From Swiss-Prot:
Substrate binds at L134, V135, S136, G137, G138, D167, G180, N272. NCBIfam families: gcp_kae1, T6A_TsaD_YgjD. It comes from Salmonella paratyphi B (strain ATCC BAA-1250 / SPB7). Belongs to the KAE1 / TsaD family. Its cofactor is Fe(2+). Gene3D superfamilies: 3.30.420.40. It catalyses: L-threonylcarbamoyladenylate + adenosine(37) in tRNA = N(6)-L-threonylcarbamoyladenosine(37) in tRNA + AMP + H(+). Required for the formation of a threonylcarbamoyl group on adenosine at position 37 (t(6)A37) in tRNAs that read codons beginning with adenine. Is involved in the transfer of the threonylcarbamoyl moiety of threonylcarbamoyl-AMP (TC-AMP) to the N6 group of A37, together with TsaE and TsaB. TsaD likely plays a direct catalytic role in this reaction. This is tRNA N6-adenosine threonylcarbamoyltransferase. Binds 1 Fe(2+) ion per subunit.
Length: 337
């Protein structure tokens, strides 16, 4: 069985084809980073228009890459939410239209479930149960996962997501969009310990996060210490260390409260090398395992949507003739498979 996956929730157009026996057959991705760079962030209207231009050509490229034709596709999966409403509607409309034209099922996919299941695409996929850390520009959540659709929210950010805090702090440091990866690169040249940032909400019980205060702390630190290159690198290092330590502390608490031995990390920020190293070290000490997707599957992509669509289709999930998206869509509302 082969599923075509379409991802258009924000500023990446991702198309992939997944075969339940052969694995990933094609993966095409177009990033709009250059389009939005001059604005310092994603402009929803521009994102939607660019998805309109790129989605169909990328589908054609994916079919060519896989050596397939439309008649070889058994189902079409598309991101139905959460995300930017206009961007979601592009992918949903194309996906639903193709499914109708090809006379195959259409499968609406939850964007964050796609991220959560992305490590399943690797050679050594995690087994249930596990604690999942979903960490991206729009979400920071800890979730107890005991099966497909069996998700319990343990904690989440009460303000900025970790990825959003990275991007905002990068902007304060004068870095271009997207700032998160550039801040991490700058942090690698920084001196540890010159500046010490707080670890928000780690001095109290619970698994919720708060990252907005770190941005304010960074702004005050920059204002008080000048902006020579080394100082900026040292501030970037202090900021990254604070975010990574906070995530690690909360993950440890979540593992202790659930008793699970496996940790899955997913979402754009999961590509951060410092975070990966710290969590791997923590799990080694706990005699547990940590799992994550390869870097290209940490950010938005069609492969995770094709795979999640395959899983959901086998569980009996399909869409009706309507084109419906949900810009806000709690993961806990998904049915168990």
């Amino acid at each position: 069985m082969r599923v075509l996956g379409i991802e258009t929730s924000c500023d990446e157009t991702g198309i992939a084809i997944y075969d339940d026996k052969k694995g990933l057959l094609a993966n095409q991705l177009y990033s709009q980073v250059k389009l939005h760079a001059d604005y310092g962030g994603v402009v929803p209207e521009l994102a939607s228009r660019d998805h309109v231009r790129k989605t169909v050509p990328l589908i054609q490229a994916a079919l060519k890459e896989a050596g397939l034709t439309a008649s070889d596709i058994d189902a079409v999966a598309y991101t139905a939410g959460p995300g930017l409403v206009g961007a979601l509607l592009v992918g949903a409309t194309v996906g639903r239209s193709l499914a109708f034209a090809w006379n195959v099922p259409a499968i609406p996919v939850h964007h964050m479930e796609g991220h959560l299941l992305a490590p399943m695409l690797e050679d050594n996929p995690p087994e249930f149960p596990f604690v999942a850390l979903l960490v991206s520009g729009g979400h920071t959540q800890l979730i107890s996962v005991t099966g497909i659709g069996q998700y319990e929210l343990l904690g989440e950010s009460i303000d900025d997501a970790a990825g959003e805090a990275f991007d905002k702090t990068a902007k304060l440091l004068g870095l271009d969009y997207p700032g998160g990866p550039m801040l991490s690169k700058m942090a690698s040249q920084g001196t540890a310990g010159r500046f010490v940032f707080p670890r928000p909400m780690t001095d109290r019980p619970g698994l919720d996060f708060s990252f907005s205060g770190l941005k304010t702390f960074a702004a005050n630190t920059i204002r008080s210490n000048g902006d020579d290159e080394q100082t900026r690198a040292d501030i970037a290092r202090a900021f990254e260390d604070a975010v990574v330590d906070t995530l690690m502390i909360k993950c440890k608490r979540a593992l202790e409260s659930t008793g699970f031995k496996r940790l899955v990390m997913a979402g754009g920020v999961s590509a951060n090398r410092t975070l990966r190293a710290k969590l791997a070290e923590m799990m080694q000490k706990r005699r547990g395992e940590v799992f994550y997707a390869r870097p290209e599957f940490c950010t938005d992509n069609g492969a995770m949507i094709a795979y999640a669509g395959m899983v959901r289709f086998k569980a009996g999930v399909t869409a009706d003739l309507g084109v419906t998206v949900r810009p806000r869509w709690p993961l806990a509302e998904l049915p168990a498979a």
